[in-house]
Amino acid sequence: MPYAALEDVQAEFLNLTFTNATPVTDTEVEDFIDTYSMVIDGWVSNRYAVPVTGAASLAMLKEVCVALVKSKIKRILARGAGAKQESQEKVALEIRKEAMDILRSIKKGEQDLHDATRKAPVTTSYGYINEQQAVFKKDEDQW
């Protein structure tokens, strides 16, 4: 399930309408949306059932998806920008970094998708697995 639509991405590019004649076609934008929706699922699937369906969570993930697609399109458009290429690529990479930071914080549990369905912790015959990191201290009895 895609987290964004062509119209959502189009709203970010006021001076460009995606068609079959533009440097980035509408079909390519839809492919980018599908690809980045799968990337998002990969990042959040360790904590939440995917695809995420909660309304508030969908709104957040839509913004992340749009940002990732926007970054990809800006990098493609920057190739033909001449002198402005470096600054446009820098902006595109900053947009991508912000979106990826959100996904990392969701994966680590620092950012919560309040209305998304949480995955149950995995149990095995050897023990209980959760997202907590083990802490081992030097020169201290821990058992």
Please place each PLM-identified region on the residue numbering:
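Short loop/turn elements at secondary-structure junctions
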Residues: 71-143
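Elongated alpha-helical scaffolds
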Residues: 59, 63-72
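Conserved short "hinge" loops at termini or chain/domain junctions
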Residues: 1-61, 118-143
